[in-house]
From Swiss-Prot:
Entry's family note: Belongs to the globin family.
EC supergroup of this enzyme: oxidoreductase
Major location category of this protein: cytoplasm
Quaternary state and interactors: Monomeric.
Domain Globin: 2-148
Any GO BP annotation: response to ischemia
Gene that this sequence comes from: Mb
Ranges in coiled-coil conformation: none
Subcellular location: Cytoplasm, Sarcoplasm
EC number assigned by the record: 1.7.-.-, 1.11.1.-
Name the UniProt record assigns to this protein: Myoglobin
Length: 154
């Protein structure tokens, strides 16, 4: 299920645009995630009290966490599938400390694609969307495999 060199190039090209505003993109991704899947908000003690989109938009903590999420994801994407060293601590913390189910990683992957589609419609066509989808699936599958090793049934 690996990606071709051309597919990785499409992923990294669009990710270059994301890196121009990691905090803004991250904030939009998290807000979109919480709106589409409100149950995911319960996993974030820091944000559970944010009930409205306006409260979410004005939360510096949410913006900061969005930046952290997309920074970590960018580091993983740049490894072009050779990301075992980066996946291990992420899987460890998400399985044992945060207890984030793989399903929630699917949700955020879908949201990332939707946000990129909305922001970069001209540069994020069907081929680029397909490549990003494959890259995010590879990431999720590798996280899920680590979860299994750790005995987490998420």
């Amino acid at each position: 299920m690996g990606l071709s060199d051309g597919e990785w190039q499409m992923v990294l090209n669009i990710w270059g645009k994301v890196e121009g505003d990691l905090a803004g993109h991250g904030q939009e991704v998290l807000i979109s995630l919480f709106k589409a899947h409100p149950e995911t908000l319960e996993k974030f003690d820091k944000f559970k009290n944010l009930k409205s989109e306006e409260e979410m938009k004005s939360s510096e903590d949410l913006k900061k966490h969005g930046c952290t999420v997309l920074t970590a994801l960018g580091t993983i994407l740049k490894k072009k599938g050779q990301h075992a060293a980066e996946i291990q601590p992420l899987a460890q913390s998400h399985a044992t400390k945060h207890k984030i189910p793989v399903k929630y990683l699917e949700f955020i992957s879908e949201v990332i694609i939707q946000v990129l589609k909305k922001r970069y419609s001209g540069d994020f066509g069907a081929d680029a969307q397909g490549a990003m989808s494959k890259a995010l699936e590879l990431f999720r599958n590798d996280i899920a495999a680590k979860y299994k090793e750790l005995g987490f049934q998420g």
